[in-house]
Amino acid sequence: MAAAAEDVEFVDYDRDEEEEEDAMDEDDRGGGRGGRALPVPHIVSQGVMRSRGRLLGRSTSVLASNRDRFDSLADAGNPGHGPQRSIEGWILLVSGVKEDAEEDDLYNTFSDFGHVKDLHLNLERRTGYAKGYALVEYESFEEAQTAIKAMNGTQLLTRTVYVDWAFSRGPIQKLTSTRPLHRRSRTPPRRLAALTC
């Protein structure tokens, strides 16, 4: 079966415009049958690569210059780390929300720190209970900062909630990590090795 797969030739039914014009000229001269001629398959060698798309025919220097270009919002005033303002306002992520919490509970709690522009509490479809997090939006940075300082690590409906910025500027991994940098071994830990034997 493997030998038969190597002997197969690839057939291309796409025709170039010039070949189509030549075939039409032959039909007009009466070289063909009375009807329209059937397409003739062209055999394509395996060495030819067909490519399509936006980057076809571009030089490698153009491709290399566009490789690392991304859309971004430049903030010349504060290029460092910290919170990032969304289009509407300053959005906080509240995690650790109790399952039976309602939007009114969160709204009443967070409205003490300023005008809550929007509040979204995600609910589980099957049960109707909260998924455990909420998004709270404030108009001003000061109100959001006050809410974070006051509510982070406090009790809300007998559960400890953690409040932080939903969007932040800077790298994904902080330069000063709390975990020590050490090489990981490729061998499995002893507790897993005992289970496999």
From Swiss-Prot:
The ranges of region (Disordered) come to 1-39
- Superkingdom classification of source: Eukaryota
Q: What is this protein called?
A: RNA-binding protein Y14B
Biological process GO annotation list? mRNA processing; mRNA transport; nuclear-transcribed mRNA catabolic process, nonsense-mediated decay; regulation of translation; RNA splicing
Please describe the quaternary structure of this protein: Heterodimers with MAGO1 and MAGO2. Interacts with EIF4A3/RH2 and RH34. Part of the mRNA splicing-dependent exon junction complex (EJC); the core complex contains MLN51/CASC3, EIF4A3, MAGO and Y14.
Organism of provenance: Oryza sativa subsp. japonica (Rice)
Q: Where is the composition biased (Acidic residues)?
A: 1-28
Entry keyword Nucleus: yes
PANTHER family noted in UniProt: RNA-BINDING PROTEIN 8A
Q: Which Pfam families match?
A: RRM_1
What family does the entry list? Belongs to the RBM8A family.
